[in-house]
From Swiss-Prot:
Annotated stretches, region: Heparin-binding: 47-95
Gene: THBS1
Domain Laminin G-like: 65-270
Inducers of expression: Expression is induced by PGE2, S.aureus and lipopolysaccharide. Induced in arteries and lung parenchyma following injury or stress. Expression in vasculature, including arteries, increases in normal aging.
Tissue occurrence: Expressed by platelets (at protein level). Expressed by monocyte-derived immature and mature dendritic cells (at protein level).
Name by which UniProt lists this protein: Thrombospondin-1
Leader peptide range in chain numbering: 1-18
Motif Cell attachment site in this chain: 926-928
Effect after changing N1067K: Loss of N-glycosylation site
Ranges where the TSP type-1 domain occurs: 379-429, 435-490, 492-547
Species name: Homo sapiens (Human)
Length: 1170
């Protein structure tokens, strides 16, 4: 019954198992891309090489274009699997060439119009880029610090679920990434009909360069199982924090909160219905009858086998030539044949005779093989004589010779090896002198031996002719010998020396020990005989009586091994780990003292506790994370040191940012350590984010924010027009930017000369289009309303413009506060506003708008940071911001003690604030003097956009320098800039010549973002922003045109501007003017003026009344530049990494060219590490 039941279960398992997800590559749970493309077979485009996994092939990619795509039917299976799982696991091992950019996988459209999806390893930027194209829009998500292009083998595990992505490199978890669209919106049902899957093939210059192995899509398992199988530690499970929130009411297909494969219902596992199960039960009942019959048959066979086994147990016998022999018995048939009995089988073998190294070998009577015998004959051992040589002379007396060879191994070979005789052919003419000449060489003699190594010999005579009449004798040797080789001579084996006796099996009472020897002196070779005798030998040892065990009294320290000797003495072994001593007395070792870095050192404290025995490390300090080692002994402490790393909530998933927000890590010294910032298209406090249509940082609807409830949580008072300041003069809930009558005086703002002051009469005494009610100089024409000292009295009518107490007519800096009126160069312009304070230049001419007068401007800048060498506080180290916190004339970038407190920067816990006492009350590594305010500018670090620069704490363009780029001519006006939101929003209102509004803050590495909006249907030209500004001839510009158009003036050069976003570097040899104007309009390169670094290949222009959000990242140290432009929540254009080191930083600003009503809103800049 048990057998029948077991067979039934096996049958059921077999039926159900047909629908399991196997782990091999022949199902839809694992898709090996190389195998599917046929690349695993020999072919062009790749070369088979050795990889880290010896069980599968690795390929060096030589030409990815020649590697075929995945077949459509297999690709369709993959698409179905991705859609069913709502994600995938991508595994790959790669060795990518250093600093290269290469595509691992790509879904390429069959019509060659682009890619639907790609995974690209960007070695230049150190990122893994995921590019998705949905409804014609490209979305790029980058996983930062993915250092794959190192020339070393790396293993990646990419886990994509819905709109989330998680990357592991080897066993290390990278930062979470969020896709802009769910992955299943890319892997549509009809994807296989419009696209194909390619490996290593990307766009132009994006093919993978290096070696790939085990590129596979995996389904039906978890990242934790994959990483565990790779040998990653179990702590990896703690890092699996990818959000698996319920989407549209359904749970994700790939889960990360359990171990093992995902659970499926019975129907999904077995794939059979209840009716089929009922039918199977009936069949099993029939099977039971058959099995019962089989049991009876097996029982009968068992009995027969027992009888047969009894027969086989009888001692085996052999019969040979009618004689019976016992098992293992040996006998000799004749002198050349020996036999033995083995398990009833007679085995006979012929004796193999070696080759004899002599010519007189004979077979003795009663033996099988011949022997060499010594001989008394003088000719024994010699080979036969060779033939006589030719006569050595053609005339006169000559000689002939012949030779023979000796077998010197077995014979004495008495006698000569050469015989000589005279010969005479004819008489010679002796009347003249002649030199001697050699005769021909004699034939070579036979080899001197019949086996092994011997020699052969030949001779010649100086008689062809013989020297006469004082002729010269022959030169050279008369005899020549060389080696000859016969078959190797047989060598009989000889015993080597006995080995020492091994250790006796007991220490007393009589034991056994043995020794052995080898047949290797010499080893039998070339048919020689084996050694005769035994290989091993035994003898009795330690016959004396056993003494009393001295270890029975436990004389050693607990845990120490005790060794007893025959004479009753004993010996203790080494002390246990964690102790030191002689084994009898052991004392605890202080591992914390012996290994001073065994545990984490924090603020000079070694966080280690010594125990008896062993030690343990204290937990990592607050805001740090790491292991807590413990153990025993110095060796353990040295090999298992504690490592505590600063905790980063943004990467370990412990932050509470909204899913539509980005987590920005501020450092482990900040409290809190991170800041949440809503992504483009959303607004709020980062914990709660709501829709933001106009991208000005304010949500469309009120949000219920817990803390600081009014900050960017209040409903946008102009939801369709950017107004980051939310100004509302009449408090009617409609922002000034979209309120047609802000002051409610019944006069529309576009005709109101005081739109923010109630003045229905519209009086304007000075006719400057600014009404008397709001005119800061009502009797002086001043449409710009400039008010330098912000006292309410305009500059046009103020007696003291800068408010320094010195009247304008006596003030040498009318627009700059300078009570001392110092004027070093006596040019009438005070030092505070003099662009050449040490050189006389009353005209203050500054042709290149770099704030250095032409008189003292030499433009010599070796480090390209925008500050000429004689004015640069670090002339050989780029530091565009010129930060100098101790005001010692040496910039922080090249100053080893930035705060001049006597503590070197690398040891100072407040690098920018003097604190010689280095007091740190909470022991977090940040001194009390700069706690929560590193640069001591009274702005908390969490709110400070440049926490390491006391001169910059918030974004502010209220003060800016206007730079005209085409100052000559009257075809258009200069730009007109309106400042709002305390300098965080600017509006350019007129159709104008190219111009800039450049702020005065200077930056090294910087992030710059803002909202771009064209609030008119008129015109279709350029607007954008500048960065790295150093002068009007040297800057980077990002500019955007709506439609393709040629510039109306073709002089001095023809300029064709294409629609789309461009990134350009300006290095003009002429400066502002018509050359630079046309070069800026032109999309492309203009020698001596402008070079285009990148232009949007899709040529997408801006749209009227549409909000866009840009994000710029500039890292001058590496030359990294990246510009991303969002339209709403989606990325509209992405330059990707651009590298250019023309300028090492500078100022930021805004750019317009022939375009009116350009809104630059919610401007933000932030200092970044280089």
């Amino acid at each position: 019954m048990g057998l029948a039941w077991g067979l039934g279960v096996l049958f059921l398992m077999h039926v159900c198992g047909t629908n399991r997800i196997p782990e091999s590559g022949g199902d839809n749970s694992v898709f090996d891309i190389f195998e599917l493309t046929g690349a695993a077979r020999k072919g062009s485009g790749r070369r088979l090489v050795k990889g880290p996994d010896p069980s599968s092939p690795a390929f060096r990619i030589e030409d990815a274009n020649l590697i075929p795509p995945v077949p459509d039917d297999k690709f369709q299976d993959l698409v179905d699997a991705v859609r069913a799982e709502k994600g995938f696991l991508l595994l790959a091992s790669l060795r990518q060439m250093k600093k290269t950019r290469g595509t691992l996988l790509a879904l390429e459209r069959k019509d060659h119009s682009g890619q639907v999806f790609s995974v690209v390893s960007n070695g230049k930027a150190g990122t893994l880029d995921l590019s998705l194209t949905v409804q014609g829009k490209q979305h790029v998500v980058s996983v930062e610090e993915a250092l794959l292009a190192t020339g070393q083998w790396k293993s990646i595990t990419l886990f994509v679920q819905e709109d989330r992505a998680q990357l592991y490199i080897d066993c290390e978890k990278m930062e979470n990434a969020e896709l802009d669209v769910p992955i299943q919106s890319v892997f549509t049902r009809d994807l296989a009909s419009i696209a194909r899957l390619r490996i290593a093939k990307g766009g132009v210059n994006d093919n993978f360069q290096g070696v790939l192995q085990n590129v596979r899509f995996v389904f039906g398992t978890t990242p934790e199982d994959i990483l565990r199988n790779k040998g990653c530690s179990s702590s990896t499970s703690v890092l699996l924090t990818l959000d698996n929130n319920v989407v549209n009411g359904s749970s994700p297909a790939i889960r990360t909160n359990y171990i093992g494969h995902k659970t499926k219902d019975l129907q999904a596992i077995c794939g059979i219905s209840c009716d089929e199960l009922s039918s199977m039960v009936l069949e099993l009942r029939g099977l039971r009858t058959i099995v019962t019959t089989l049991q009876d048959s097996i029982r009968k066979v068992t009995e027969e086998n027992k009888e047969l086994a009894n027969e086989l147990r009888r001692p085996p016998l052999c019969y040979h030539n009618g004689v019976q022999y016992r098992n293992n018995e040996e006998w000799t048939v004749d002198s050349c044949t020996e036999c033995h009995c083995q398990n009833s089988v007679t085995i006979c073998k012929k004796v193999s005779c070696p080759i004899m190294p002599c010519s007189n070998a004979t077979v003795p009577d009663g033996e099988c093989c011949p022997r060499c015998w010594p001989s008394d004959s003088a000719d024994d051992g010699w080979s036969p004589w060779s033939e006589w040589t030719s006569c050595s002379t053609s005339c006169g007396n000559g000689i002939q010779q012949r030779g023979r060879s000796c077998d010197s191994l077995n014979n004495r070979c008495e006698g000569s090896s050469v015989q000589t005789r005279t010969c005479h052919i004819q008489e010679c003419d002796k009347r003249f002198k002649q030199d001697g000449g050699w005769s021909h060489w004699s034939p070579w003699s036979s080899c001197s031996v019949t086996c092994g190594d011997g020699v052969i010999t030949r001779i010649r005579l100086c008689n062809s002719p013989s020297p006469q009449m004082n002729g010269k004798p022959c030169e050279g040797e008369a005899r020549e010998t060389k080696a000859c080789k016969k078959d190797a001579c047989p060598i009989n084996g000889g015993w080597g020396p006995w080995s020492p006796w091994d250790i006796c099996s007991v220490t007393c009472g009589g034991g056994v020990q043995k020794r052995s020897r080898l047949c290797n002196n010499p080893t039998p070779q070339f048919g020689g005989k084996d050694c005769v005798g035994d290989v091993t030998e035994n003898q009795i040892c330690n016959k004396q009586d056993c003494p009393i065990d001295g270890c029975l009294s436990n004389p050693c320290f607990a845990g120490v091994k005790c060794t007893s000797y025959p004479d009753g003495s004993w010996k203790c072994g080494a002390c246990p780990p964690g102790y030191s001593g002689n084994g009898i007395q052991c004392t605890d070792v202080d591992e914390c003292k012996e290994v001073p870095d065994a545990c984490f050192n924090h603020n000079g404290e070694h966080r280690c506790e010594n125990t008896d025995p062993g030690y343990n490390c204290l937990p990592c300090p607050p805001r740090f994370t790491g292991s807590q080692p413990f153990g025993q002994g110095v060796e353990h402490a040295t090999a298992n040191k504690q490592v505590c790393k600063p905790r980063n909530p943004c990467t370990d998933g412990t932050h509470d940012c909204n899913k539509n927000a980005k987590c920005n890590y501020l450092g482990h010294y900040s409290d809190p350590m991170y800041r949440c910032e809503c992504k483009p298209g959303y607004a709020g406090n980062g914990i709660i984010c709501g829709e933001d249509t106009d991208l000005d940082g304010w949500p469309n609807e009120n949000l219920v924010c817990v803390a600081n409830a009014t900050y960017h949580c209040k409903k946008d008072n102009c939801p369709n027009l950017p107004n980051s300041g939310q100004e509302d003069y009449d408090k009617d809930g409609i922002g000034d930017a979209c309120d047609d009558d802000d002051d409610n005086d019944k006069i529309p703002d576009d005709r109101d000369n005081c739109p923010f002051h109630y003045n229905p009469a519209q009086y304007d005494y000075d006719r400057d289009d600014v009404g008397d009610r709001c005119d800061n100089c009502p009797y002086n024409h001043n449409p710009d309303q400039a008010d330098t000292d912000n006292n309410g009295e305009g500059d046009a009518c103020a007696a003291d413009i800068d408010g320094d107490g010195i009247l304008n007519e006596r003030d040498n800096c009318q627009y700059v506060y300078n009570v001392d009126q110092r004027d070093t160069d006596m040019d009438g312009v005070g030092d505070q506003c003099d662009n050449c304070p040490l050189e006389h230049n009353p005209d203050q001419l500054d042709s290149d708008s770099d704030r250095i007068g032409d008189t003292c401007d030499n433009n010599q800048d070796i480090d390209e940071d925008g500050h000429q060498n004689n004015l640069d506080n670090c002339p050989y180290v780029p530091n565009a911001n010129q930060a100098d916190h101790d005001k010692d004339g040496k910039g922080d970038a090249c100053d080893h003690d930035d705060d001049n407190d006597g503590i070197p920067d690398d040891k100072d816990n407040c690098r920018l604030v003097p604190n010689p006492d280095q007091k740190d009350s909470d022991g977090d590594g940040r001194g009390d003097a700069c706690k929560d305010d590193f640069d001591h500018d009274s702005v908390p670090d969490i709110d400070d956009i440049c926490p390491e620069n006391v001169d910059i704490s918030e974004t502010d363009f209220r003060r800016f320098q206007m730079i005209p780029l085409d100052p000559k001519g009257t075809s258009q006006n200069d730009p007109n800039w309106v400042v709002r939101h305390q300098g965080k929003e600017l509006v350019q209102t007129v159709n104008c010549d190219p111009g800039l509004a450049v702020g005065y803050d200077e930056f090294n590495a910087v992030d710059f973002s803002g909202t771009f909006f064209i609030n008119t249907e008129r015109d279709d030209d350029y607007a954008g922003f500048v960065f790295g500004y150093q002068s009007s001839s040297r800057f980077y510009v990002v500019m955007w045109k709506q439609v393709t158009q040629s510039y109306w003036d073709t002089n001095p050069t023809r300029a064709q501007g294409y629609s789309g976003l461009s990134v350009k570097v300006v290095n003009s040899t002429t400066g502002p003017g018509e050359h630079l104007r046309n070069a800026l309009w032109h999309t492309g390169n203009t020698p001596g003026q402008v070079r285009t670094l990148w232009h949007d290949p899709r040529h997408i222009g801006w749209k009227d009344f549409t909000a866009y959000r840009w994000r710029l990242s500039h890292r001058p140290k590496t030359g990294f530049i990246r510009v991303v432009m969002y339209e709403g929540k989606k990325i509209m254009a992405d330059s990707g990494p651009i590298y250019d080191k023309t300028y090492a930083g500078g100022r930021l600003g805004l750019f317009v060219f022939s375009q009116e009503m350009v809104f630059f809103s919610d401007l933000k800049y932030e200092c970044r590490d280089p």
